[in-house]
């Protein structure tokens, strides 16, 4: 099975690691990135003859189109704004395509390519990481396992293993993607209908086992991809919130209210700068902190079973960094699900064609089994909603 991987950063490294170390049947991985240093680091880390690296601009069709010829699956681990064009190139080459998504407008453009992909006999699957991605797959699995679902709550966070100043946070994935999640509107289902609400709102507290204890969660954008449309009319209420150590939401809300998340350029002393780009650069510098990270996930569905009895079903994941192999928890929980889906596409386990909702075509049981094979502790619970969680 032949894969082309766009991006050799943190998540691209995790995807390549998984395809070469865990996925069955991989014959080649071609990694493309504009940064030669990132490619050199990838080659040194993996030390696998099946890996080939190519330095260049992923947005250049003259570079990427020949690389896609003969590939089974193309995976995008670059910033979300590249994904629609890369999907088009993969479709033209007859290769399946998936990405880590995270931006609703870009994903909508990928869905506009569905007929094009179907005609070429390929699948395009956006939003295949942690959230969006795994969270939606697990949430759909829980909700549809009930006769009627009253509430589906998805809570996910990538955090330092212990809170670190100045924001009780460390960079664990793209800073641009993080800011996008914090400022774009969030999709929810309220009273059976899809609605949008502002991000950085509806702050709540929740508890995880020690040493984490009481944490906070708040609305953010893009974490559940197409799940609201898929479950509209089938679930009374659905929302997704990002988990952080307490106090983080108020800090970032202040930055946003001051205009530091605005994308448009501002003029200063004869020059112009985008506040968002400046903020991203500063965050990358100041929040690229040492120490391991952790990923926390809680998916919880409440409703009634086929006998009309109230029931709560939940899945909890607490995943830690693989320090032996230098793979962070966020890399594991973002890159591994994407690589698992890529292998499903290459093996023919996903038979539908066109642009696809990952929650409808990726079997949750198979995903959970593959994650457990990678030593991810996926815990499943079921009980009466009146019982303690």
Placement of each model-derived feature along the sequence:
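Conserved Rossmann-fold cofactor-binding substructure of NAD(P)-dependent oxidoreductases
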Residues: 58-70
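Hydrophobic/small residue at the entry helix of a nucleotide-binding pocket
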Residues: 11
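C-terminal catalytic/substrate-binding lobe primarily of soluble NAD(P)-dependent oxidoreductases
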Residues: 145-389
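Rossmann-fold NAD(P)-binding glycine/threonine-rich loop
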Residues: 101-124
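Helix N-cap at the beta1-alpha1 junction of Rossmann-like dinucleotide-binding domains, i.e.
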Residues: 34-38, 104
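Conserved N-terminal Rossmann-fold NAD(P)-binding element of oxidoreductases
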Residues: 3-8
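Beta-loop-alpha module in the N-terminal Rossmann-like domain of NAD(P)-dependent dehydrogenases
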Residues: 62, 73-90, 105-106
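Rossmann-fold cofactor-recognition segment
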Residues: 46-60
